[in-house]
């Protein structure tokens, strides 16, 4: 049930995996949760009603993109991001920091914040911890992120430590700027690259700030999966058990299964939507590339057992035709399929944890991927 305050409850455990609920005034988020990415106020190639019907309880908006276009103040005048974009449930916004570090031009970073030029028109902006929280407040998101500095991996240890310590100081400033908002939350972001002692230092310091939730950032940025999982094994035991844990920017279905097993509750990634726009489908059989000629005369659907019309009601031959022809409907149908599969996976994960059968579910799911797609006709 919805509540006036922000709250998190663990309902079941299976090893380190947790099944629970995040309660907010705008709705309940069932965890483990996958958040479709609505970068600029839209989950690309999807209607918001479709996203909801697939089982998503929460979506993500991107502070950097929204502050540049249409502008946070304009969104506020139009009633906030929920009203503006037609999504009535909870919304999480990132701080904009990752995009500033990776997309923006001519960055200048110091203790106060970061100045940069828009990748769209070259206009100069300044992002500080206080301004990031102000923008997220104008967007009226339900869960907000601290501003942090995310370094690309591999990174020299000295630079990684400097960025981590700066992010901790920025977390303190974000906490002050956020203040007391009972129905909302600000999450701190654990940084430290691929260095265990830095991750420990970051997690311990953020834990001491007694925030409402905790994110793990700076992973899934090109490092091997084993490194990401090693860092989760360092961080998750430190973070409070009664607070939600969010792994930012992750990831593949396999990443999700292995991260849930280490105690992560929330995920987001552009992968299912981006892959759909490039002809790639996620299914119970693993990844299926609809560009391949083997599908050109295949009358079978992607997955006859799926509840999603895109997966069940359209032939592989038709999807292949749409993708090869560059038709917009191809991107729409494959994005629909992919988000349906991700939510199907999360639903299965939650049920398996509740039943104490998460390891069995993981084994069955990975065996399905390993068997591969149905044989070609």
UniProtKB/Swiss-Prot annotation:
InterPro entries: ArchSynthase1/Queuine_TRR (IPR050076), TGT (IPR004803), TGT-like_sf (IPR036511), tRNA_ribo_trans-like (IPR002616). Residues 249-255, 273-277 are annotated as: RNA binding. Pathway: tRNA modification; tRNA-queuosine biosynthesis. It holds the Pfam family TGT. Substrate binds at residues 94-98, 148, 191, 218. Keywords: Glycosyltransferase, Queuosine biosynthesis, Transferase, tRNA processing. This is Queuine tRNA-ribosyltransferase. GO terms for cellular component: cytosol. Its EC number is 2.4.2.29. It catalyses: 7-aminomethyl-7-carbaguanine + guanosine(34) in tRNA = 7-aminomethyl-7-carbaguanosine(34) in tRNA + guanine. GO terms for biological process: queuosine biosynthetic process; tRNA wobble guanine modification; tRNA-guanine transglycosylation. It comes from Brucella melitensis biotype 1 (strain ATCC 23456 / CCUG 17765 / NCTC 10094 / 16M). It is an enzyme of class 2 (transferase). The active site is at 94 (proton acceptor), 268 (nucleophile). Catalyzes the base-exchange of a guanine (G) residue with the queuine precursor 7-aminomethyl-7-deazaguanine (PreQ1) at position 34 (anticodon wobble position) in tRNAs with GU(N) anticodons (tRNA-Asp, -Asn, -His and -Tyr). Catalysis occurs through a double-displacement mechanism. The nucleophile active site attacks the C1' of nucleotide 34 to detach the guanine base from the RNA, forming a covalent enzyme-RNA intermediate. The proton acceptor active site deprotonates the incoming PreQ1, allowing a nucleophilic attack on the C1' of the ribose to form the product.
